[in-house]
């Protein structure tokens, strides 16, 4: 079985290495950066191809000789990548988090009879899978709350935050209206709104605020009340609101000293050195998914907790582990014919397949990514 991983950045590299550990899979990584490809080649028995994903037809040509693909490209390239992979008639598991609605490609995917598993990371991804699983065990699911964040272990003033990707992606989370489900209706709320403090054993108190992370859950799950909130150290949301309301996240150019500049570009340029995760710096991922409902006439609640830390042995960030392993495990199951949903498949459908769900959780556990279930 020949698999091509499209994009070999931080997460794509982890996916490729995990897939390559399976002796039955022949793995190739593709990226526009020779440096990124060489970094993965030094760490795993894979092949490399230079591909410029922005060129029309490049993805279609790249996947033509492979049995399936994995998508790990930047979000702005994600939708076109999916489209070209589907046009080539290949299965794909994707983490690219494209802003467009991937369900628009469902008819094409069904026509081509391919499996297209999208948003298959940690959040979206495992958050949806856990929600889908818990809801499927109930006679009636009434609410779903997803709390998730990636944070540095050491807190450095003023932002107490670190990233491993472009700050523009994070800023987008802070300006895009958050869609939540309230009493069966989709309601838009300001990002960074409704801040609340939440305690996590072993970590302490974090703050949670509204972000637009429900995505496909808003359409696929018949749960009348759903929300997704991002977790940060307390005080972060207020700082971000101050920047946003002052105009630092604005996309309309302003003239300064005779030069026009977009405030958001300047802000990202200034924040990146302060936010960038340093080499070897410890970080962790924390997530809590809570689904409440009724079973046999009684109230029931399923809670899933994850706390995952930087892996010092492999020098792998928690965000790359929790995102990449979910994707690589599901890619392996698709490759082996154990998950065969045709068309565009949001991750919550994985949770509704109890056999696949249990395999996924067990494989994650083997890699040290453990979701603790509590039923009450």
Where are these regions (language model features)?
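N-terminal Rossmann-fold NAD(P) dinucleotide-binding loop
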Residues: 12-13
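Rossmann-fold NAD(P)-binding glycine/threonine-rich loop
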Residues: 95-118
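Helix N-cap at the beta1-alpha1 junction of Rossmann-like dinucleotide-binding domains, i.e.
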Residues: 33-36, 99
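N-terminal Rossmann-like NAD(P) cofactor-binding module of classical short-chain dehydrogenase/reductase
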Residues: 63, 67-72, 92-94
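Beta-loop-alpha module in the N-terminal Rossmann-like domain of NAD(P)-dependent dehydrogenases
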Residues: 68-85, 98-102
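Conserved Rossmann-fold cofactor-binding substructure of NAD(P)-dependent oxidoreductases
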Residues: 52-65
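Conserved N-terminal Rossmann-fold NAD(P)-binding element of oxidoreductases
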Residues: 3-7
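C-terminal catalytic/substrate-binding lobe primarily of soluble NAD(P)-dependent oxidoreductases
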Residues: 137-376
């Amino acid at each position: 079985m020949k698999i091509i991983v499209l994009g070999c950045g931080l997460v794509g590299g982890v996916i490729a290495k995990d897939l390559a550990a399976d002796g039955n899979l022949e793995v190739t990584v593709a990226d526009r950066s020779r440096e990124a490809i060489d970094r993965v080649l030094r760490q795993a028995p894979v092949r490399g191809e230079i591909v410029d994903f922005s060129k029309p037809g490049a993805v279609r040509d790249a996947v033509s000789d492979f049995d399936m693909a994995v998508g790990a490209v930047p979000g702005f390239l994600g939708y076109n990548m999916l489209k070209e992979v589907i046009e080539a008639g290949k299965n794909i598991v994707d983490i690219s988090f494209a802003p467009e609605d991937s369900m628009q490609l469902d008819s094409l995917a069904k026509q081509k009879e391919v499996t297209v598993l999208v948003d298959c990371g940690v959040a979206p991804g495992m958050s949806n899978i856990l929600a889908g699983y818990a809801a499927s065990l109930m006679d009636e699911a009434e609410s779903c709350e997803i709390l998730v964040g990636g944070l540095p272990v050491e807190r450095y003033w003023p932002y107490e935050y670190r990233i491993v990707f472009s700050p523009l992606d994070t800023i987008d989370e802070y300006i895009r209206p958050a869609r939540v489900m309230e009493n069966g209706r989709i309601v838009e709320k300001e990002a960074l709104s409704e801040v609340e403090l939440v305690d996590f054993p072993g970590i302490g108190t974090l703050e949670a605020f509204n972000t637009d992370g429900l995505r496909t859950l808003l359409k696929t799950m018949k749960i009348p009340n759903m929300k997704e909130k991002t977790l940060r150290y307390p005080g972060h949301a207020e700082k971000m609101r101050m920047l946003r309301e002052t105009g630092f996240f604005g996309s309309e150019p302003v003239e300064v000293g005779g030069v026009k500049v977009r405030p958001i570009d300047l802000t990202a340029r200034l924040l990146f050195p302060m936010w960038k995760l340093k080499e070897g710096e410890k970080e962790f991922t924390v997530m809590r998914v809570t689904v409440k409902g009724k079973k046999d006439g009684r109230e029931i609640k399923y809670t899933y907790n994850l706390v995952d830390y930087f892996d010092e042995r492999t020098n792998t960030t928690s965000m790359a582990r929790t995102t990449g392993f979910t994707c690589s495990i599901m890619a392996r199951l698709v490759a082996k014919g154990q998950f065969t949903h045709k068309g565009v498949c949001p991750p919550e459908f994985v949770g509704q397949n109890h056999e696949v769900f249990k395999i996924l959780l067990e494989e994650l556990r083997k890699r040290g990514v453990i979701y603790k279930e509590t039923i009450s």
